[in-house]
Amino acid sequence: KGDSERDIAKKMKIDLISRGADSIPYLPVISGEGGVSQIIYEPSSRVIKNGDILFLDTGSTFDGYFCDFDRNYAIGKASKIVNDVYEVLWIATQNAIEIAKPGLPIYKLWSVMINSLNKYLPNNFSKGRFGHGFGLQLTEPPSITFDNDMKLESNMVLTIEPSVEFKPGKTLVHEENIVIKEKGAELLTSR
């Protein structure tokens, strides 16, 4: 509280470099009261205040490989709807992680996530892709969409990233990184 989005982005860049990142070419730091209006945006001079949700996303590199990772932070106490939406995003993400294994058509990851969102948030405005591959590029195939019948393969690295616009102009996203192994998904991110 008291710092601007830009201040937080600078501090995060310093921290990432001090922990070994080679570069940070992608770092949206976005805030908004009760949620954010968009997730792909440059940090601004907007000062963080109580009641805000702070969305941090990074596409940092190490040894030529990208990570793609986001988190949401409530400044002060989050509202009930924000807590509820975040919990549903967590459930949707977990449901996708649990079914991810070699041979699974990618659209099934999308389906399990959209079904989770629709079950608990029937009036949501979710659409688009809910994750993608990454590695040598920040965004690589496959895209986790409703119509992608490509099958998961061992050693694919994916971001599982459901998002929901839970009311007009208010969005939350939850993201986890996984690698596909013979027996299922291995979580790469810390929870």
Feature annotation, model-predicted:
Residues 1-191:
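Active-site neighborhoods and metal-handling regions in enzymes and metal-associated proteins
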